[in-house]
Amino acid sequence: MQSDRNLSHLNSKGDVHMVDVGDRPSTFREAHAQGSIQMDRETFDLILRGETPKGDVLAVARIAAIQAAKRTWELIPLCHPISLSGMDVDIQPAEHLPGLRLNCRCRTTGPTGVEMEAMVAVSVGLLTLYDMLKAVDPAMTIGSIQLIHKSGGRNGVWNR
């Protein structure tokens, strides 16, 4: 997708700066991001049976994703601290990989979008799964982290 718009994080001199969103109206905004982790069949089966050595890896990954979304502004240098009004994290088996697919939906009402919070949540949730399972499967692969949907603000709705 190409755009004629300028990069908003560069000022007129080409220097990096944090965008001033102070005069933008507060609107409802939503973003959905997704990613996956591929693993050995044996590791996948351990998760499905609830027999992983470190306990409930799915619950820990959900909490990690939520924490990460709330701290996005501390991790991504030019992101604004925003107030999340809601968030859903869903982790589903993906038999064909074999592996897991992690989806995150974030919501806010404010002057800036919530895409980065959803993307960071997916990334950290998947990294947490890797961390908790690496002892049994160090060859796992994280991939396909992508924005699926965003809405709100001046650019309206975008879908992959």
Swiss-Prot record:
Keywords: Lyase, Molybdenum cofactor biosynthesis. One of its GO terms (molecular function) is cyclic pyranopterin monophosphate synthase activity. GO terms for biological process: Mo-molybdopterin cofactor biosynthetic process. Residues 1-11 have a biased composition (Polar residues). Substrate binds at L78, C79, H80, M116, E117. Residues 1-20 are annotated as: Disordered. The keyword Aminoacyl-tRNA synthetase does not apply. Catalyzes the conversion of (8S)-3',8-cyclo-7,8-dihydroguanosine 5'-triphosphate to cyclic pyranopterin monophosphate (cPMP). This is Cyclic pyranopterin monophosphate synthase.
